[in-house]
Regions:
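Hydrophobic residues on short alpha-helical segments
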Residues: 18-22, 49, 61
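Small/flexible residues
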Residues: 41-42, 59
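Helix-turn-helix DNA-binding segment
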Residues: 1-40
Length: 75
């Protein structure tokens, strides 16, 4: 799954963050899951949005779902 997300030009960590964003998690929750501070997660999200050329988390999540069908199995 991460390989499909990193093929979008994201780092492995950004791919992890995007997978959690696509599952509907907020920065605080993602930080707890990944052992990072919410501000760090916020910066990762900013980089993700910039690299994907989208304006919000919802658009980034839509790209993640379109690129990685395994995310659908998580619901």
């Amino acid at each position: 799954m991460l390989e499909q997300l990193t093929s979008l030009g994201l780092t492995e960590r950004e791919g992890e963050v995007l997978s959690w964003v696509a599952r509907g998690k907020g920065n605080y929750e993602i930080g707890v899951i990944l052992g990072a501070k919410p501000r760090t997660i916020c910066k990762h999200v900013e980089h993700i949005l910039s690299k994907l050329n989208v304006e919000n988390r919802t658009a980034a999540a839509a790209i993640a779902f379109a690129r990685c069908s395994q995310l659908l199995d998580l619901f």
